Amino acid sequence: MNVFPKKIMLLGSGELGKEVAIAAKRLGCYVIACDRYNDAPAMQIADQFNVFNMNNGSELKEVIYKCNPDIIIPEIEALAVDVLKEIEQKITVIPNSRATAITMNRDKIRDLASNELNIRTAKFSYAVNQSELDLHAETIGYPLLIKPVMSSSGKGQSLVKNKNDLAQAWNLAIEKSRGKSNKIILEEFIDFDLEITLLTIRQSNGKTLFCAPIGHEQKNGDYQCSWQPAELTESVLEKAQQIAKRVTDNLGGVGLFGVEFFIKGEEVIFSELSPRPHDTGLVTLISQNLNEFELHLRAVLGIPIPEIVCHEASASRVILASMETTDVAFTGLEQALSQSNTNVFMFGKPSSTEGRRMGVAVAKAETIDEARIKADNAAQSVQFINE
């Protein structure tokens, strides 16, 4: 018998963690939100919160043993994963410590997909110094992408068009790298037709479910807008689902995974994977009967998912801060919400820097183009001000 309530610890309390916390509270769970800064979005929902450096293994272990959760849900990559491996003997880690460790580093997930599973990816190589970078860049060819092996939300990513840009790209990647790693990945630039996320749900009954594919656009590697359903041929969708299942089956565990692909003609090229709700999946807050956060919690808690319904053409657009402030204020909600089938979700971040993601606008319409226009208009209506 599955006895509730469960005590859930979130490691990471940003906007995605906040929506996970909301979904958990609706199922009667006790939520403990953790992050490196106070008043993080999920902390505003949680029953309890802790502020500490989650990269510090001793601090992480101390907080986990003090709180004694039933389930630990990592919501970010910057974690002392060795502690999770040890803790996993006593406490459930979602999806598991191995998947968390593999997906926090671009080299590990890329090696798994390309080398172990023989899945098509962009051509890639690694470098730990400038001379290796120069050598591998000539082999891969220009243009190419340079990224830190450890980073998130596109931090440290550069599109390099010729060898004159290599030094600057190297310096940026090292500067923005998470932790002390000086390893970078060089990646072939794919001139793709479409970039998609396939939300893939592994359940405790052994079944795997898929949401309708989500198309998205990025700027410097960071999500800007998404739409659902993305238009794919049946054969392309089937290929993407097969690849997503192969990779997630290898990683194991339960929960929702965000699997990213490049689509070029009939070719499906694996890009990245997150073992948790995905930022591009924020569109599901309006597009589906169960959003990605509710699906994640149902899979984690062993609750049935009878069906996943994508209602109609839907889109999202991020709301970005235009200034740096510790006193966040904004206007424009009246205009943003004057359109039918439109909503705005502000994340409640306590401070902003220029370009920081502070919210998202979502909309439904008869067509994807109409939904995207509505979401764009709503997002543009929200303006940040100095009070």
UniProtKB/Swiss-Prot annotation:
GO BP: any one term: 'de novo' IMP biosynthetic process
Matches recorded under Gene3D superfamilies: 3.40.50.20, ATP-grasp fold, A domain, ATP-grasp fold, B domain
Residues that coordinate or bind Mg(2+): E260, E272
GO cellular component: cytosol
Protein's UniProt keywords contain Magnesium: yes
Catalytic activity as recorded in UniProt: N(1)-(5-phospho-beta-D-ribosyl)glycinamide + formate + ATP = N(2)-formyl-N(1)-(5-phospho-beta-D-ribosyl)glycinamide + ADP + phosphate + H(+)
Annotated ATP binding sites: R106, K147, S152, S153, G154, K155, G156, Q157, E187, E188, F189, I190, E195
Signal sequence extent: none
A UniProt-annotated Pfam family: ATP-grasp
Pathway where this protein functions: Purine metabolism; IMP biosynthesis via de novo pathway; N(2)-formyl-N(1)-(5-phospho-D-ribosyl)glycinamide from N(1)-(5-phospho-D-ribosyl)glycinamide (formate route): step 1/1
Keywords carried by this UniProt record: ATP-binding, Ligase, Magnesium, Metal-binding, Nucleotide-binding, Purine biosynthesis
Subunit structure: Homodimer.
Membership in a protein family: Belongs to the PurK/PurT family.
Function: Involved in the de novo purine biosynthesis. Catalyzes the transfer of formate to 5-phospho-ribosyl-glycinamide (GAR), producing 5-phospho-ribosyl-N-formylglycinamide (FGAR). Formate is provided by PurU via hydrolysis of 10-formyl-tetrahydrofolate.
Name this protein carries in UniProt: Formate-dependent phosphoribosylglycinamide formyltransferase
The species this protein was found in: Prochlorococcus marinus (strain NATL2A)
Record gene name: purT
